[in-house]
Amino acid sequence: MIKAYKLYTGEDGHSHFTEGTVTYKDLKEANSILFKETAPHASYDWHPAPTTQYVITLSGTLLFETFLGEQFTLKPGDVLIAMDTHGSGHKWQLIDDQPWKRVYVAFNEDTAINFVPDAE
């Protein structure tokens, strides 16, 4: 299974995350695919996701944080499932010496995402 973090907006209007895995159930129809690279040590302040999307990290290690202080570390090979398209959003910072190379795969908001949360 592929490690994944799902970012979503809770009923309180703030972003939260759940750790889990991406499953291989079925194909999903994507709206767009975008490749992007950001220089080492970069950061991006508070923002919601522009659309529901997978963000597949190819290189770089990042610290993500929600407005309420929840944090997780995204590593190469991990998938961020960004669903916090409204509310307080999240921020990130590159914490290693590598550029963040990634692939964005955008979906419709009503697309069922193949995600299984870790057992608590």
Range-by-range predicted roles:
Residues Y44-W46, F64-E65, A82, S88-D96:
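Short beta-strand His + acidic residue motifs that chelate non-heme Fe in jelly-roll/DSBH
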Residues V22-Y24, F67-H86:
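Short acidic-glycine-tyrosine-enriched beta hairpin
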Residues H47-F64, A106:
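Short, conserved beta-strand element in jelly-roll/cupin
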Residues T9, V22, N31-A49, M83-G87, ...:
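Conserved short histidine dyad/triad with adjacent acidic residue
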Residues I81-T85, I95-A112:
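A short hydrophobic beta-strand segment most commonly corresponding to one strand
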Residues M1-Y8:
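Short acidic, Pro/Gly- and aromatic-enriched capping/linker segments at domain boundaries
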